[in-house]
Design a protein with these regions (language model features):
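Conserved functional hotspot residues or short segments at active or partner-binding sites
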Residues: 341, 345-440
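Coil residues (strongly favoring Ser/Thr
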Residues: 77-78, 134
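Glycine-rich, charge-decorated loop segments at or immediately adjacent to ligand/cofactor-binding or catalytic sites
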Residues: 153-158, 229-250
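C-terminal motif of bacterial Sec signal peptides marking the signal peptidase cleavage site
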Residues: 53-54
Length: 459
């Protein structure tokens, strides 16, 4: 305190020395008397100095908060001052990962969702740049791109084979990680120093981007190549629910036994869980770095800036996807072939008196050959359904009960792959109630929650 007092007196003396001529001039042509002018100037100078010290102290506090957050902590005392600040994606935290990429040969695993927020206007309008374009502009040595299902530019149908090629905008080689080449080959990783994974997931087990991440991390571990995951929000991250994957039914639609249909984790959290729980099944551990978000929590509602895949066109579709995605294993059309993908369901054989919404699927972007192409479907319009916080099986259960050809309702192999268990189809066919079915998976969900809790980066 004594040092501060001496500093204040010293600064005041210096300022008065240089400003004395100005003060004399002001007094000469002012109605204020000399003592009043002197006191006013002194008060003004003192106030300016105090404000400067105060601003400096606030800057120091801000830096300490950023340091705490960047250390990946969820200590609520540490982040209380910035909980109302805007969300910062992992991809936007260039200061955290650019030093790791300098001088390295880098491969990006990405698709159209790999966006960085460039600027936000006062009216809320946002401008984005693709991660690949951003890294190239910062002189990062990108050597190629790996792309997941739907391709790097996101134009392929679900399940459609995506061929290797060259990105027309950047000229970079694009290697498909879908179809027969789901895992990067050793020759495709030759000479690579770093892998950067940045893809928007939607938090649903049968959404294939987690499987792609699994294979990328597995190949990286075997080749001793570090992996950086740029974390993004989970739009379905506020709850954990649904049937749990059984080991005998694991596939590209669900790689890990014991995981519920909705896991409630960000892709960065899930990556850490895969690595630490030894789900990669590699002799070497993967060298994994997760760049966490700032100011995020699992209850936050996040509106995606672009569709994460061709048939999830908006937030409503993303919200309903955990419930309606199971329709892929039934005879029901879930909106493919319309602009209302995963917001409507229907089929020609549902009774019109109970399913009054009509639509006709036609080939379109994301669905070249939809179920019931060109046929009138009776169904439900779910575009106004309020936000769900669970997997709602009522849509499928009621459709099954109202479907005339019950033996043709399920595609057993596909439904089991999506559900992760053969039990769910049997439960629906045997007439169990929604509540009975939901109760049947609660014990397994609790087991998963115990594992999940070890890897959460956010509240």
């Amino acid at each position: 305190m004594a040092i501060i007092a001496i500093l204040i007196i010293g600064v005041e003396a210096v300022l008065l020395y240089f400003l004395a001529p100005i003060m004399r001039l002001a007094v000469k042509y002012s109605k204020f008397n000399r003592p009043m002018a002197f006191r006013l100037l002194k008060s003004t100078l003192f106030l300016v100095f105090v404000i400067a010290i105060s601003c400096g102290n606030r800057s120091g506090n801000k830096n300490s908060i950023q340091t705490v957050v960047s250390q990946n902590t969820v200590n609520t005392d540490s982040i209380a001052g910035i909980q109302n600040s805007k969300l910062i994606l992992g991809a936007n935290r260039t200061e955290a990962y650019l030093p790791l990429l300098k001088g390295k040969k880098v491969v990006v695993v990405g698709n159209p969702s790999s966006l960085i927020l460039k600027k936000e206007l006062p009216n809320g309008e946002k401008t984005y740049v693709h991660l690949v374009d951003s890294l190239l502009s910062l002189d990062i040595n990108l050597v190629k791109v790996f792309s997941p299902e739907h391709g790097f530019r996101g134009t392929a149908d679900a399940g459609e084979t995506v061929k290797d090629g060259k990105d027309p905008k950047t000229g970079l080689p694009v290697i498909s990680l879908y179809g027969s080449n789901k895992k990067p080959k050793p020759e495709q990783l030759a000479g690579v120093d770093m892998l950067v994974f940045d893809i928007q997931d939607v938090g649903v087990r049968f959404y294939s981007y987690i499987a792609t991440l699994h294979y990328v991390m597995q190949a990286a571990a075997e080749a001793s190549i570090p992996v950086i995951v740029l974390d993004r929000p989970n739009p379905n991250g506020s709850y954990v629910d649904g049937p749990v994957m059984e080991a005998e039914h694991t596939s590209f639609l669900g790689m890990h036994a014991g995981v519920p249909l909705v896991h409630g984790m960000t892709i960065g959290e899930y990556a850490q869980m895969m690595a630490e729980e030894k789900w990669l099944k590699t002799q070497k551990d993967v060298d994994l770095t997760v760049i966490p978000m700032k100011n995020y929590d699992h209850k936050m509602q996040y509106s995606l800036p672009v569709r994460p895949s061709p048939n999830l066109p908006n937030d409503q579709a993303v919200m309903l996807y955990p419930s309606l995605g199971l329709c892929e294993g039934t005879t029901l059309n879930a909106g493919r072939g319309t602009k209302m993908q995963f917001q409507i369901i229907g089929a020609p054989f549902l009774p019109a008196e109970k399913y009054a919404f009509n639509y006709t699927p036609q080939p379109n972007f994301g669905s070249k050959n939809p179920k019931f192409k060109g046929e009138n479907c009776n169904g439900l319009d779910l575009r106004e359904v309020p936000r769900l916080n669970k997997v709602d099986l009522s849509f499928i259960i009621n459709a099954y009960r109202n479907y005339e050809k019950k033996d043709a309702f399920f595609n057993t192999k596909n439904f089991t792959a999506h559900a992760g268990t053969a039990k769910l189809q049997k439960q629906i066919e045997s007439g169990l109630s929604l509540e009975e079915i939901e109760t049947s998976w609660q014990k397994e969900i609790q087991n998963f929650l115990n594992i999940r809790s070890k890897y959460l980066l956010y509240e």
